[in-house]
Each structure stands twice: as structure tokens, then as C-alpha cells.
């Protein structure tokens, strides 16, 4: 039996069965927290005595708080290290950082733009490494999104999900999820901000039901869920140009009316109200954005439990 650590790096690298185990664990842990009567298959404090190192290249609120609280609720603890403290790849090598931290802590969560740095950290770490976010992907967010959809609408298999906006890390993880969980993902982006060749090649080779286009109305029509994200991601410098390209992709009541009557609206937050989404939509009855935010905590507890071998 392999002693290799269980890394959580990207959804397309994990079997659907294990991803489902992670989701089920998150649901069970949330139910347990909400009601002591809920059935629970995990030990009371499965991560008692465990320590998670959280590395942040840039400041973060949601990721930091949700992982810290999640570790506490599971009986463990966490410590935070900032990019300024770590000097990843600029002082000590990433490989050496991985080796040293593996001697101190039981798992590492890292939020860093450079995806290759994440992969190098995982290569040399002897403890689980969790992708808290990179420029390439954001699997923790999408696990929370999947959990939220299924809470409200049941199994996502066979459903239609629409994305309107630009190509980014959240969309990449949604594409991976579409292949793993067998649902249709319709993507509408400006031609200038469409998924690049690596993602287009992956979509073609994966056989996933993913439709690329430029018309937001066509993408949203008849969808079970409508997704968007901020138009200017971290590190982007051409904000005004991007805003002009993306104005036709705003999620408003007119666009939402084309989706199914019971369609959900999702946004990973923080939202720029009046830009990618209107107040009427994000505060409306179809919006589940704050359930998504809450479920970051519970989905990530499922991820932590899986990484430590408490589930799956």
C-alpha cells in the first residue's frame, strides 16, 4: 500500500468516486454541526493533534478563515504564513520549503498564483498539499459550489450549468467538474477573453459536455444554474479594457429570465455589484451566494478529512 500523501490539487486529477466521498463528507460534517441528531460516520475529532500550515502569497479573508475554522471544528489547528515571510522561490527553494514544512506540520494549504510552484511543493512534500487557489484553478471553491447546487437542486449529473464572463481559474475547475460529474457546462465569453488553447485542447480530449461560445443568452437559456465572477482578477492590469469587453455579459434579471424558472445564481464572491451582476440578481430569490460562502467551510472540511484519510 502506497504511503504517498493525499494531495488535493485539481479536480481532473481525482477519480469521481473520491470527489464524491469528499462532497459527502462535507455534507455530513455540515449536518453534524447544524444538528447533533444528524447521522455522522466520522470520528468526533478526526484531526485532533494535527496542524495545517496555510501559505498565502497575498492576503485572503475567506480562504484563511474557512480553513482555520474548519481545522478547529475537526479538532486540529492551523498556522498562517504570508508570502513576505516565506519568500517562496526567491530565498529558500520551494523544494526545500516543502521538505522543511513536512517535518513541522501535518498538511499544507497554499494560495499562490504560480501553479507550477504548487506542483513543485506537492512533489517534494511528504504531507498532503491542498490547492487553495492558483491562477490556473480553484478546486476548493468549485467543491463548495457543487455542494451548494446539490443542497438546493439534488444531483448535478445531467444538469446544465451556464458561465458568463471571462476565462479564469474558477471556470477551469468548473470544466474539470463537468467532466468528472457528467453535467453540461455552457461557456459564454468575449472572443478576446475565451479559454486558451491548453483548456480548449483539454476540453476536446476529455470528451466532457462543454460548449464554448460568445453569446450569453444562448449559454443561459434553459440552464439550471448561472455562474459568473469578477471581471478583473488578481494581477490583471487592463481593467478598463476588460470592463468594456464584458459589459454585455452582466448577469441581470433579463438574462436570468432566460434560464429555468428555478435556476440558481452563483458567484464565488467578493462581487462587484453593478458590474458582473446587478443587486436585483445577487440579492434576489435565485441567489445562493452566501450559501456558497458558508459551504467553503464545510466542503474544505471534507477535503481536509479526505487528505488525512478520515474518509474515502
UniProtKB/Swiss-Prot annotation:
GO terms for MF: amino acid binding; ornithine carbamoyltransferase activity
SUPFAM superfamilies associated with the record: Aspartate/ornithine carbamoyltransferase
One Pfam family cited in the UniProt record for this chain: OTCace
Keyword Thylakoid assigned: no
Assigned EC number: 2.1.3.3
GO cellular component, one term: cytoplasm
GO biological process terms, semicolon-separated: arginine biosynthetic process via ornithine; citrulline biosynthetic process; L-arginine biosynthetic process
Pathway(s) where this gene product acts: Amino-acid biosynthesis; L-arginine biosynthesis; L-arginine from L-ornithine and carbamoyl phosphate: step 1/3
EC category name: transferase
Binding site for carbamoyl phosphate: 60-63, 87, 111, 138-141, 268-269, 296
Localization per Swiss-Prot or TrEMBL: Cytoplasm
The keyword Transcription regulation is annotated on this UniProt entry: no
Catalytic activities: carbamoyl phosphate + L-ornithine = L-citrulline + phosphate + H(+)
PANTHER family attached to this UniProt entry: ORNITHINE CARBAMOYLTRANSFERASE, MITOCHONDRIAL, ORNITHINE TRANSCARBAMYLASE, MITOCHONDRIAL
Function, in words: Reversibly catalyzes the transfer of the carbamoyl group from carbamoyl phosphate (CP) to the N(epsilon) atom of ornithine (ORN) to produce L-citrulline.
Name recorded for this polypeptide: Ornithine carbamoyltransferase
Source organism of this protein record: Rhodopseudomonas palustris (strain BisA53)
Amino acid at each position: 500500500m502506497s504511503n504517498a500523501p493525499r494531495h488535493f490539487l485539481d479536480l481532473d486529477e481525482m477519480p469521481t468516486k473520491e470527489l464524491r466521498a469528499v462532497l459527502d463528507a462535507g455534507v455530513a460534517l455540515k449536518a453534524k454541526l447544524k444538528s447533533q441528531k444528524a447521522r455522522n460516520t466520522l470520528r468526533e475529532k478526526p484531526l485532533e493533534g494535527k496542524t495545517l500550515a496555510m501559505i498565502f502569497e497575498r492576503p485572503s479573508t475567506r480562504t484563511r478563515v474557512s480553513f482555520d475554522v474548519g481545522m478547529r471544528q475537526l479538532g486540529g489547528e492551523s498556522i498562517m504564513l504570508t508570502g513576505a515571510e516565506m519568500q517562496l522561490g526567491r530565498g529558500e527553494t520551494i523544494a526545500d520549503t516543502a521538505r522543511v514544512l513536512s517535518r513541522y506540520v501535518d498538511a499544507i494549504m497554499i494560495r499562490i498564483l504560480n501553479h507550477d510552484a504548487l506542483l513543485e511543493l506537492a512533489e517534494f512534500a511528504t504531507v498532503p498539499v491542498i490547492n487553495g487557489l492558483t491562477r490556473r484553478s480553484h478546486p476548493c471553491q468549485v467543491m463548495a459550489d457543487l455542494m451548494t447546487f446539490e443542497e438546493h437542486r439534488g444531483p448535478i449529473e445531467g444538469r446544465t450549468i451556464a458561465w458568463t464572463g471571462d476565462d479564469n481559474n474558477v471556470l477551469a475547475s468548473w470544466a474539470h467538474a463537468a467532466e468528472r460529474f457528467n453535467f453540461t457546462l455552457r461557456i459564454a465569453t468575449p472572443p478576446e477573453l475565451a479559454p486558451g488553447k491548453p483548456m480548449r485542447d483539454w476540453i476536446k480530449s476529455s470528451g466532457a459536455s462543454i460548449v464554448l461560445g460568445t453569446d450569453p443568452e444562448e449559454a443561459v437559456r434553459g440552464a439550471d444554474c448561472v455562474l459568473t465572477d469578477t471581471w478583473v482578477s488578481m494581477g490583471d492590469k487592463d481593467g478598463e479594457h476588460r470592463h468594456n469587453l464584458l459589459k454585455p455579459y452582466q448577469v441581470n434579471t433579463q438574462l436570468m429570465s432566460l434560464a429555468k424558472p428555478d435556476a440558481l445564481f452563483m458567484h464565488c464572491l467578493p462581487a462587484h455589484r453593478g458590474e458582473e451582476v446587478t443587486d436585483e440578481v445577487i440579492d434576489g430569490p435565485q441567489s445562493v451566494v452566501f450559501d456558497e460562502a458558508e459551504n467553503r467551510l464545510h466542503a474544505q472540511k471534507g477535503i481536509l478529512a479526505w487528505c488525512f484519510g478520515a474518509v474515502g
